[in-house]
Amino acid sequence: MKQMNQITIYSPHEINVAEILKNTPRIPHKKGNPGRSNKPVIIDMVCAFDIESTYLPDIEQAFMYVWQFQFGEYTIMGRTWEEFLTFLQRIRDSIKKNERVIVYVHNLSYEFQFLRGIYKFTAPEVFCMDRRKIAKCEMYGAVEFRCSYIHSNMSLDQFCKKMKCQTRKLTGTFDYLKIRYPWTPLDDTEIAYCINDVLSLKEAITNEMQADGDNLETIPLTSTGYVRRKCKAAMHRKPAWYQYIHDQLPDYELYVALREAFRGGNTHANRFIVGRILENVHSIDRSSSYPDVLVNHQYPVRYFVNRGPSSMDRFLKNKNVHKRACLIRIAFHDIKLRNYFEGCPYLSKDKCRNTTGGLFDNGRILKADYLETTITDVDFDIIDRMYEFRDPVILDSWYSSYGDLPQEFTDVIKDMYRIKTALKGDPDNSILYEKTKAMINALYGMTAQNPLKLTFEFFDEDYHIKEIDPSEELMRNNKNAFLVYQWGCWVTAWARAELQAMIDLAGDGVHTVSQFAYCD
């Protein structure tokens, strides 16, 4: 036991684990929620875990020399993995089989690389968001580690600042290059660096839950979980929402076409001025672009009907006369920029297929003898203005009706934006401001989430891609959907169209350098 700055630091064997857990309340499951009945009962105690490691460059090997565990109000430090495993086993032996202690780790993916060397994980014990990206893992059927970095999408220092923690991650003079072993004595400064990480993380999670009215059972696992929860509740208030959404959900064939058409923002360096230093540059920030287009543009709101190959006349009639949302696979012959000095060519080489005779600028198409691509009607309008081409052929086509997104959904967006604007600069509501700002930023990610993202499992001491039948998996995921994937495709398309309109207003950026504008 060591006393330092009014904090008592215990070694693992000095803690009466059984007595602490016996006197800690359990979080009851919400009544009327049958889905929770089979889930573990959560111990109502916020815990945090962290390790410090040394890297030996000669053998390219890292090892842990100290670990720290914030066990509720108790701060624990240990020096060996044997101590750590024994401590976890004492937790296991002190609770029921259906109970769990929740422990937050900032960047669990790093600690997991050490944990996998001391514990044989099975596939059900590890939740991978990607290869080597661990959202949570479980040990001994008793302790669940959750990644607070994935939860907050912030560094620990940023997270603690935004949650107004009294304890902060220490920064400055700590020598991370010093070789330390489990038997190396640590001075008070080094110990302070170690324990502050778990003290501050525990405080940040606690402050956040208090601000949001959450507990360890209801707190979202990821940063996008907050906005998903809010929007899902809003959609459930829409009359016949389930039928409304499920009438629009794509089948596998349409999903593939939507994946082909989906792309993100339009970011590119003007080939004529890249590397030059410009003067008299004026910048324009298109604030909250994705929330803006979600509220102020229309989207496909009926099921897409596949019409197969189509003539250009039929496509243009559907687009311009009937004002339908269009998704097309199209081939262009002899396509090239109308303006040679165009600084941001729209067509991306990665989103085109079977391209021949192409001339490219850092992945963008300046011209090509032939190419195929999948686009929305919004994309087509941009391409038609920017490029000239011959004999376009529509290889496949889908059509839907345009309409506003559900008011229940857009009201949430407007309310969040209103709150963020009202609370900006208000020190008494800084946590709510930061949470609302983060939720606004997460709106796009929620709408554009790929329902068939690769799923990884960890077993046999390695990562494996989970084998699935994509069509069956899509049907399974569709059962729980409260948004439709095509909305995400159109969100980015409308945002690119708005950005392109600003670029067009700014000029070509070469002959009007004094009026050049960078649009973000």
Residue ranges of model-derived segments:
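Short N-terminal binding/cap micro-motifs at the start of the first secondary-structure element
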Residues: 55-59
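N-terminal accessory regions of nucleic-acid-interacting proteins
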Residues: 1-47, 51
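Conserved acidic
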Residues: 41-42, 60-106, 112-520
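Activation of the activation-loop gatekeeper triad in protein kinase-fold domains
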Residues: 51-52, 287
